[in-house]
């Protein structure tokens, strides 16, 4: 039996609190950057970030964050109900 929702079951303004959590590590960022062939120093070079950025440390790749949030949402929103990903609008970093 499906645990998620079909598109026509969603209502504008629905809010979901997802029970899954995960600590994101520096190694996650390094692995994701390497897997996606992204050499951006902003994500992988601690020395560069300490000298040249206002944050002083590497930033997590925003596409990793988006993918993680989608993954965390699957079990209670779309598990076994997704037919296709129809796209995303208004995604902001």
PLM feature spans:
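Hot-dog-fold acyl-thioester-processing enzymes
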Residues: 2-87
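Beta-rich strand-turn-strand
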Residues: 92-93
């Amino acid at each position: 039996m499906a645990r998620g929702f079909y598109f026509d079951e969603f209502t504008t303004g629905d809010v979901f609190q997802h029970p899954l959590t995960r600590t994101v590590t520096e190694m996650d960022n390094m692995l994701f950057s390497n897997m996606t062939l992204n050499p951006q120093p902003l994500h992988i070079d601690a020395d560069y970030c300490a000298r040249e950025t206002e944050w002083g440390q590497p930033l997590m790749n925003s596409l990793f964050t988006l993918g993680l949030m989608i993954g965390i949402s699957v079990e209670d929103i779309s598990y076994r109900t997704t037919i296709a990903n129809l796209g995303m609008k208004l995604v902001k970093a």
